[in-house]
Amino acid sequence: MKIVLFPGRNLSTTAIAAACDAVAGYPQRLVQRIGHPVMWIGRLTDMLDRRLNRDTDSDPVRYRNGFVAMSIIATVPCATVALVQVFAFRRLPPPLAIIAGGILGSSLSAQRSLWEHVRAVSIAARQGLPQARAAVSHIVGRDPAQLDEAAVMRAAVETLAENFSDGIVAPLLWMSLGGPAGAVFYKSVNTADSMIGHRTPRHDRFGFAAAKLDDLVNLPASRLSAVWILLAAMTMADMDARGAWRILRRDAGHHRSPNAGWPEAAMAGALGVRLSGPRSYNGVVSHEPWVGDGRADLTPHDLDRALALYRRACMLQGGVLVALSVMLRRAWRARRPS
């Protein structure tokens, strides 16, 4: 049976996914009834961690089992969704299959969720420091009890920048390459890294493969996310696009992460503030270098500006996705014999 596909169908699917996520997000009722794709991947990761990462294993065995676990995590969910994609395009009209793929793919992006969680920190900050600490504790791993208002605002802006890359740009980029299956591949790797890719006695060796693969799959999206932030800053009068470019070139590589420094540096430069710096995790102070040249004493107003920049960057990304999918469709029509 011949399969007739729209050209640029992955781009069209991705554009629909981005729009659905921005408008509706992932409904809480679905979370309560069937869970979320990330939760399912998390269960698979947890099961493999319990079965393959035994305390009695030697270091070489833990390294090996970590690679085995990542092979399963990266391929099984992706292959399952890929089979569904093939079935959909065999059985459904291409436009309907693209729409269905976009709705499915929207669950793998976090535009609306990230906006709501970071916006909650801004709202809570107007009510008091305890409320702001409680709100930011939902989105950061550091100890909120040690944070003053400026540190809470920095933590929220840093989370916004970093998660714009790995929560939105990365899954949409992988979706544009491989459809929902591509996004599932990325989310599987990213979820595994968040669960087992830590430098702890239990996961330092078993999680090595997860951490390194996550760094690799996030490499293009982290750079692209910085581009979106830079372009968004160029369209906003109260942002410093030149500063974003300067700080991006100077500080992106100074971050502890090979990827997170890119969107964070672009965000810091555009806002004219300093991000990163020393922070405390479970009572242990981590002396991280500063990113940016401006003020470190951020206010709720700075967080609101960061949210506005984030929203503009998401809009630019969505507009480019739509434009590219339309251009590919028209180019394909022009090439078809009349």
Task: Name what the model sees in each region.
Residues 194:
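Solvent-exposed interhelical
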